[in-house]
């Protein structure tokens, strides 16, 4: 069996694009092989900052042959009255590269069997340049020379080998060959690959570890060894450390780890500042002692070997110290002012030119936060903390530290608030109001912080909607979808049952033109996030649609609950029977909605009485408070009497009084069904 190698040689690709580009190359190659019916043993990906590559092992000699049956026109349309082939039949034959002599007739139609022979592998692989390499898409492009062609970075060389033979094609003016490039500084620039199987070893001899996973494991091992040697504690399994490890891995081809040191005096700066300076700005790994206390050392990785490593360490230490000097200055300078001083500056900080200032945004957030807190029955101390947090929670935006390190907004707000004597609960809320910072990030831990986070995001959505600055398509420049996701997740994980419609309606009415949004549109926007989150959790589309639809209930926690309840019970043996019975009630009830006043004296059969006995004592509001599962269980218990009812009862009887009474009885059940959703959207399987 043969091996095929494709390498795309590039100018330095930004670290954050390397892994996604490698993944895209693999996916496009996989689709290419499937489309051409060419089987391989494995698809091995490789990448460095200067190259993307894929190796196909055990490549079949040729693609699989294919026989397809094509159905043509009916026999009546294929032949005329004289038994001659019609234009429709002749056109069908031409389209398939055949003649009517090749026709078969069965099942009232003419058929053709189209056989496609397998194609030699090399004749297929020569197309990979046009169908894979040239078709790749990126979030960032570069144009070079006089080409209209755009790519992540300029293509400088191409290697395409089928075993030992070059597969000839070109992209722009770059022709494939067998010559790659070694490490930019450590080896001879040009490296000849004699056979596709030699790719990894040839590059390793040229100081390039081309396998990204092997390279990452080497970095991890080197860092761990240095930490162990110095009795330091190094955390590499957090999300932040994993992201840094991925980034560092994508800026080196031959990794060599090293340790550096900085003056102990800088440890007086908050840990978050030191860590941000090291991790975010210098790509350094911080270390601690075994009690978790930050140490005046760091670990980093160079793209090279150990030669002149002392010079590299000294250079990195010098750059870090310059950063820390700035941080120390800002930290001391910020403490010479008060929160009130910073808030005066916040009053002039623009939130959005169509909406107003950050200070005005904070005031509106305070109104919303109080409304939410009161609906959650916060005590007096909690309400006081919510009020104070809302008054000051953006003050740190005007500090020198956040101006220099904008990643620290909220974090420095909490730290400074404590230094300035604020209640710890208020200080924590300042940090937490940004949470969650991603679709899967942690929500605010404290109740004060969570209320502030929800209120801050709600005001942003309402005011941006009022200013007609809503997301369109994939475009969401103000992060409103992320904000809505944060609202839903916070309410869900806190298990806070809040009817959003009355809260937002009253808020919009009280805040004038700046908040004069279509609240129905705002709520639908938030419900879209409910749909996405539950779909992402693996719930069926029809169950999500059913659970979100037809409800005046704008408590997102309850809506998520009923979606999950429908999903859980969809596996029950009687789910089909239950849903069919309930949707039959629904279809009839919505045609003639009446009040719930049922007169038992108008019953004409035992089935009506049985259904009445099963439903007359139902307390709708109580069942809803108990939760969606209680609603479903109650409705499922009605399946048998409903079935019996419809077998024995004609709802649309001629007697108007009896008919209306029957609709009233069905309407009792319909109102309860509505608390579970629009069950007609459920696809019964």
Curated annotation (Swiss-Prot):
It catalyses: tRNA(Gly) + glycine + ATP = glycyl-tRNA(Gly) + AMP + diphosphate. One of its GO terms (cellular component) is cytosol. It is found in: Cytoplasm. SUPFAM superfamilies: HD-domain/PDEase-like (SSF109604). One of its GO terms (molecular function) is glycine-tRNA ligase activity. Keywords: Aminoacyl-tRNA synthetase, ATP-binding, Cytoplasm, Ligase, Nucleotide-binding, Protein biosynthesis. One of its GO terms (biological process) is glycyl-tRNA aminoacylation. It is an enzyme of class 6 (ligase). It comes from the Bacteria. Its EC number is 6.1.1.14. Tetramer of two alpha and two beta subunits. NCBIfam families: glyS. Belongs to the class-II aminoacyl-tRNA synthetase family. This is Glycine--tRNA ligase beta subunit. It comes from Leuconostoc mesenteroides subsp. mesenteroides (strain ATCC 8293 / DSM 20343 / BCRC 11652 / CCM 1803 / JCM 6124 / NCDO 523 / NBRC 100496 / NCIMB 8023 / NCTC 12954 / NRRL B-1118 / 37Y). The gene is glyS.
């Amino acid at each position: 069996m043969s091996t095929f190698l494709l390498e795309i040689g590039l100018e330095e690709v930004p670290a954050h694009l390397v892994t996604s580009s490698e993944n895209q190359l693999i996916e496009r190659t996989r689709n290419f092989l499937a489309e051409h019916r060419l089987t391989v043993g494995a698809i091995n990906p490789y990448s460095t900052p200067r190259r993307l590559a894929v190796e196909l092992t055990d490549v079949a000699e040729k693609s699989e042959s294919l026989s397809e049956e094509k159905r043509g026109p009916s026999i009546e349309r294929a032949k005329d009255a004289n038994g001659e082939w019609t234009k429709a039949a002749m056109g069908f034959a031409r389209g398939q590269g055949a003649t009517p002599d090749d026709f078969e007739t069965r099942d009232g139609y003419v058929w053709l069997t189209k056989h496609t022979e397998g194609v030699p592998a090399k004749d297929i692989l020569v197309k990979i340049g046009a169908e894979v390499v040239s078709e790749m898409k990126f979030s960032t492009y570069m144009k070079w020379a006089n080409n209209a062609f755009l790519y992540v970075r300029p293509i400088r060389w191409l290697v395409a080998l089928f075993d030992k033979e070059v597969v000839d094609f070109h992209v722009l003016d770059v022709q494939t060959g067998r010559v790659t490039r070694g490490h930019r500084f450590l080896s001879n620039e040009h490296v000849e690959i004699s056979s596709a199987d030699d790719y990894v070893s040839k590059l390793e001899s040229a100081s390039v570890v081309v396998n990204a996973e092997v390279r990452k494991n080497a970095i991890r091992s080197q860092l761990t060894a240095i930490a162990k040697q110095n009795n330091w504690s190094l955390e590499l399994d957090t999300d932040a450390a994993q992201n840094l490890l991925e980034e560092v891995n994508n800026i080196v081809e031959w990794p060599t780890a090293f340790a550096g040191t900085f003056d102990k005096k800088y440890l007086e700066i908050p840990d978050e500042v030191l860590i941000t300076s090291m991790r975010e700005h210098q790509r350094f790994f911080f270390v601690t002692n075994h009690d978790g206390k930050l140490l005046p050392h760091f670990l980093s990785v160079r793209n090279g070997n150990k030669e002149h490593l002392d010079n590299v360490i000294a250079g990195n230490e010098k750059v870090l110290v310059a950063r820390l000097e700035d941080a120390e200055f800002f930290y001391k300078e910020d403490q010479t002012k008060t929160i009130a001083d910073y808030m005066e500056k916040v009053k002039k900080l623009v939130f959005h030119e169509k909406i107003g200032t950050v200070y005005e945004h904070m005031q509106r957030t305070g109104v919303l936060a109080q409304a939410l807190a009161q609906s959650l029955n916060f005590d007096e101390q909690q309400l006081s903390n919510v009020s104070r947090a809302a008054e000051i929670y953006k003050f740190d935006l005007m500090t020198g530290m956040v101006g220099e390190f904008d990643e620290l907004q909220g974090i420095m707000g909490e730290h400074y608030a404590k230094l300035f004597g604020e209640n710890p609960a208020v200080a924590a809320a300042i940090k937490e109001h940004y949470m969650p910072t991603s679709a899967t990030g942690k929500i605010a831990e404290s109740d004060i912080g969570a209320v502030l986070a929800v209120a801050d995001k709600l005001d942003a959505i309402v005011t941006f909607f009022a200013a007609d600055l809503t997301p369109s398509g994939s475009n969401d420049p103000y992060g409103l979808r992320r904000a809505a996701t944060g609202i839903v997740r916070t309410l869900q994980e806190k298990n806070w049952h809040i009817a959003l419609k009355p809260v937002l309606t009253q808020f919009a009415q009280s805040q004038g033109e700046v908040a004069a949004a279509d609240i129905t549109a705002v709520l639908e926007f938030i419900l879209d996030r409910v749909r996405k989150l539950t779909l992402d959790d693996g719930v069926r589309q029809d169950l999500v649609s059913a659970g979100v639809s037809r409800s005046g209930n704008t408590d997102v926690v309850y809506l998520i609950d009923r979606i999950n309840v429908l999903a859980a019970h969809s596996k029950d043996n009687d789910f089909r029977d239950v849903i069919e019975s309930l949707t039959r009630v629904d279809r009839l009830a919505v045609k003639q909605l009446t009040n719930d006043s049922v007169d038992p004296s108008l019953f004409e059969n035992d089935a009506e009485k049985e259904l009445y006995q099963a439903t007359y004592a139902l307390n709708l509001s109580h069942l809803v408070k108990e939760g969606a599962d209680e609603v479903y269980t109650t409705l499922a218990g009605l399946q048998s009497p409903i079935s019996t009812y419809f077998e024995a009862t004609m709802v649309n009887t001629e007697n108007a009084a009896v008919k209306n009474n029957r609709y009233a009885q069905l309407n009792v059940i319909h109102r309860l069904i509505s608390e579970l959703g629009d069950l007609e959207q459920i696809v019964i399987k």
